[in-house]
Design a protein with these regions (language model features):
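Ferredoxin-type iron-sulfur electron-transfer modules and their immediate structural context
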Residues: 2-225, 229-232
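Conserved small/polar residues in nucleotide/adenosyl-binding loops
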Residues: 245-247
Length: 247
């Protein structure tokens, strides 16, 4: 009986000593957490999409609290979240425009010529390994196999009649689809942009017309019609400088 009591006492004393030691070490090596970082993190939506350029919401919160990122850096939260974070940081929200993803192709199944019917893996990233880079005759357009659809965390992009179509209302401009498209057909543009070029072909006009009914042929008529001088034609494709367009 005495042995049991002694053993229990020894265990208790050892536990007490270890507890005190751990408590001391915890205080000595404790990492101070900025309360602003905690408050900012609480306002971020938590999607961890990476659209802000940081690894996730935790990393962005730390950067904002340290003054290394703008209060409006979260594309998902938008202006409402930016205002809340600005209040926490004691700053103001800068001018920002709502952005949305845009697919530079209108060559759907009805307008774009197909060389053959493809029934293989439905993934745009494997197309460089199949004949002609995919079934469509145009080697610049949307392949329509949905790599961008899989990448979107907001269900904002779908394949409709053979091409990717963005739902502007759902799009949070996180940029994941932009990074995923192997043909670099997707870019972020202002949400309210009305003048766009839905083509990326660099082929000459005659070649474009032979594979697509709606492709840009580089005729330069748009450059002559634009009163703002915002449209240029380079490599047989029209480009619009949206900063020069007065909507």
């Amino acid at each position: 009986m005495t042995g049991i009591i002694i053993a229990a006492a020894v265990v208790s004393i050892v536990g007490l000593i270890l507890g005190l030691f751990l408590g001391f070490m915890g205080k000595k090596f404790a990492v101070e957490v900025d309360q602003k970082e905690i408050d900012v993190r609480a306002e971020l939506p938590g999607n961890n999409c990476g659209g802000c350029g940081y690894a996730g919401c935790d990393a962005l919160a730390k950067a904002i609290a340290a003054g290394e990122a703008e209060v409006g850096a979260c594309p998902v939260g938008g202006e409402p979240v930016a205002k809340k974070i600005a209040a926490i940081m004691g700053s103001e929200v800068g001018d920002s425009k709502r952005m949305t993803a845009f697919v530079k192709c209108a060559g759907d199944c009805e307008k774009a010529k197909e060389n053959y019917h493809y029934t293989g893996v439905q993934d745009c990233t494997v197309m460089p390994f199949v004949p002609n880079g995919g079934s469509k005759a145009c080697t610049y357009g949307c392949m329509g196999y949905g790599s961008c659809v899989k990448a979107c965390p907001f269900d904002a992009i779908h394949i409709v009649n053979g091409i990717a179509v963005v739902d502007k209302e759902k799009c949070k401009a996180c940029g994941k689809c932009v990074a995923t498209c192997p043909r670099h057909l997707i870019e972020l543009i202002p949400y309210d942009a009305k003048q766009v070029v839905k083509c990326a072909s660099k082929d000459k006009g005659k070649d474009v017309m032979s594979v697509c009914q709606t492709g840009c042929i580089g005729c330069m008529m748009c450059t002559k019609q634009c009163e703002f001088g915002a449209i240029t034609v380079e490599n047989n494709i029209a480009h619009i400088d949206l900063s020069l367009i007065h909507i």
